[in-house]
From Swiss-Prot:
Gene3D superfamilies: Imidazole glycerol phosphate dehydratase, domain 1. It comes from Corynebacterium efficiens (strain DSM 44549 / YS-314 / AJ 12310 / JCM 11189 / NBRC 100395). It holds the Pfam family IGPD. Belongs to the imidazoleglycerol-phosphate dehydratase family. It is an enzyme of class 4 (lyase). InterPro entries: IGPD_sf, ImidazoleglycerolP_deHydtase, ImidazoleglycerP_deHydtase_CS, Ribosomal_Su5_D2-typ_SF. The lineage of its organism: Bacteria, Bacillati, Actinomycetota, Actinomycetes, Mycobacteriales. This is Imidazoleglycerol-phosphate dehydratase. Pathway: Amino-acid biosynthesis; L-histidine biosynthesis; L-histidine from 5-phospho-alpha-D-ribose 1-diphosphate: step 6/9.
Length: 202
């Protein structure tokens, strides 16, 4: 089993955004985040810190229109960088879950580093469709962010909001729970020397 840090990088430039991401799965939670969207920066910082990922995200987007393009395109690039960092999947734990509270909110994230991209979100209260945090982050985009992340990193991801009222608390618990579940799923398992699949491939 290799002991070299697993580092992934990806970039994306379009007429709507210019994004660079680097992630070290074997980091300590050192982050360098700048998307021009303060609440999104806060969420990505939480993602890096609670995943113990060294994470750099630099994004310039058409935020004068809205946050959607920058958030979704960042998810594309973060997913691609995550896929790059995971590599051949030899020796990883593969499956993991995390239940994470934030005050009145409780969120669960379940991850399979499967090579089969799939996403499910369930349980968010109806007001998450219309809530806006900090005047710029519409919480309806949570679903788009995590779905895009799952598709581009080729993982299976389920996010369940068991309960909660405050859109900030629900959103932050989602980001932290996904980070914690990913952290555990990509950990190296000392008892697993090959690819964790009966098929021999993921």
């Amino acid at each position: 089993m290799t002991t070299a840090p697993r580092i992934g990088r990806a970039t994306r430039t379009t007429s709507e955004s210019d994004i660079t991401v680097e992630i070290n799965l074997d980091g300590t939670g050192t982050v360098d985040i700048d998307t021009g969207l303060p609440f999104f920066d806060h969420m990505l910082t939480a993602f890096g810190v609670h995943g113990s990922f060294d994470l750099t995200v630099h994004a310039k987007g058409d935020i004068e229109i809205d946050a959607h393009h920058t958030v979704e395109d960042t998810a594309i690039v973060l997913g691609q960088a995550l896929l790059d960092a995971i590599g051949d999947k030899k020796g990883i734990r593969r499956f993991a879950s995390c239940q994470l509270p934030m005050d009145e909110a409780l969120v669960e994230a379940v991850v399979d580093i499967s090579g089969r991209p799939y996403f499910v979100i369930n349980g968010e209260p109806d007001h998450m469709i219309s809530a806006v945090i900090g005047g710029h982050y519409a919480t309806v985009i949570n679903e788009h962010f995590f779905e895009t992340l799952a598709l581009n990193s080729r993982i299976t991801l389920h996010v369940i909001c068991h309960y909660g009222r405050d859109p900030h608390h629900i959103t932050e618990a989602e980001y932290k729970a996904v980070a914690r579940a990913l952290r555990a799923a990509v950990e190296m398992d000392p008892r697993q020397t090959g690819i964790p699949s009966t098929k021999g491939a993921l």
